[in-house]
């Protein structure tokens, strides 16, 4: 995918295509996803109504920008607290081969299954809490807007293979969350600017281990 800056405002499908260089087929799958989101949202509140007219930027582009941060050869991605599918389901549509979406709300999980069915995305939905769900060892774990880093890391550690990485988009609290998390965890931290949230940061964490334990 190319890495041009996002145009604004009124960011639409054509802008998404220009920004990420995706194929016509991928764009069509995302358009089908958007249509389902609009259809289901009034009944089950998948995303804030105020963001529905801005899905291509606030949700699709915000998720898609993580694709370029995945290590080469990433096969299995586990997305925690997927909600309406951000970022995990977008990353499956963009080409991650095996994505596991973990979402404890049964109605949201049903929506995720329907989007995966309609778009053919390689996503398996687990209608369970992340504390209980099982998935194959993950090359990468993602989560957006689920929890503070100190709560996220033990959840992510349940799924990560040795040497796996975490991708967490964070808002302006990123630095404070990192400081607190470092009390209990050692990790390599890389921070990238968010292309959709000027006050946010994309955290890529690797070499993650509880303090006092050797890295696997
Ligand atoms: C604030 S929403 C964020 C959804 C999505 N990641 C996004 O950014 O749009 C958090 C989601 O996580 C789910 N959730 C909360 N705790 C969870 C847990 N322990 N395991 C799995 N899902 C959980 C909620 O049902 C909700 O859909």
From Swiss-Prot:
Catalysed reaction, written as an equation: guanosine(527) in 16S rRNA + S-adenosyl-L-methionine = N(7)-methylguanosine(527) in 16S rRNA + S-adenosyl-L-homocysteine
Record's keyword annotation contains Cytoplasm: yes
GO molecular function, one term: rRNA (guanine-N7-)-methyltransferase activity
Gene Ontology terms: cellular component: cytosol
InterPro entries per record: rRNA_ssu_MeTfrase_G, SAM-dependent_MTases_sf
Main location group: cytoplasm
Gene3D superfamilies according to UniProt: Vaccinia Virus protein VP39 (3.40.50.150)
A Pfam family reported for this protein in Swiss-Prot or TrEMBL: GidB
Keyword Hydrolase assigned: no
Top-level taxon of the source organism: Bacteria
Localisation per UniProt entry: Cytoplasm
Residues the record lists as binding S-adenosyl-L-methionine: 81, 86, 130-131, 144
EC number: 2.1.1.170
Keywords: Cytoplasm, Methyltransferase, rRNA processing, S-adenosyl-L-methionine, Transferase
Similarity comment: Belongs to the methyltransferase superfamily. RNA methyltransferase RsmG family.
Function description: Specifically methylates the N7 position of guanine in position 527 of 16S rRNA.
Protein name from the UniProt record: Ribosomal RNA small subunit methyltransferase G
Record organism: Rhodospirillum centenum (strain ATCC 51521 / SW)
Phylogenetic lineage: Bacteria, Pseudomonadati, Pseudomonadota, Alphaproteobacteria, Rhodospirillales
């Amino acid at each position: 995918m190319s890495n041009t800056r996002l145009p604004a405002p009124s960011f639409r499908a054509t802008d998404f295509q220009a920004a990420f260089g995706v194929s016509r087929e991928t764009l069509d799958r995302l358009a089908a996803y958007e249509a389902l989101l609009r259809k289901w949202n009034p009944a089950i509140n998948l995303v804030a109504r105020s963001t529905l007219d801005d899905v291509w930027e606030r949700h699709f582009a915000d998720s898609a920008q993580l694709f370029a941060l995945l290590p080469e050869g990433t096969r299995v991605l586990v997305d925690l607290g997927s909600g309406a599918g951000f970022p995990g389901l977008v990353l499956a549509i963009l080409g991650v081969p095996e994505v596991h979406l973990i979402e404890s709300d049964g109605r949201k999980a049903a929506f995720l299954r329907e989007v995966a069915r309609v778009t053919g995305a390689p996503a398996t939905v687990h209608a369970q809490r992340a504390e209980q769900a099982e998935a194959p060892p993950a090359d990468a774990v993602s989560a957006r807007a689920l929890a503070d880093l100190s709560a996220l890391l033990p959840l992510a550690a349940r799924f990560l293979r040795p040497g796996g990485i975490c991708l967490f988009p964070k808002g302006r609290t990123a630095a404070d969350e990192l400081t607190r998390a470092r009390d209990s965890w050692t990790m390599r931290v890389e921070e990238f600017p968010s292309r959709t949230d000027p006050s946010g940061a994309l955290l890529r964490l690797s070499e993650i281990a509880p303090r006092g334990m050797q890295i696997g």
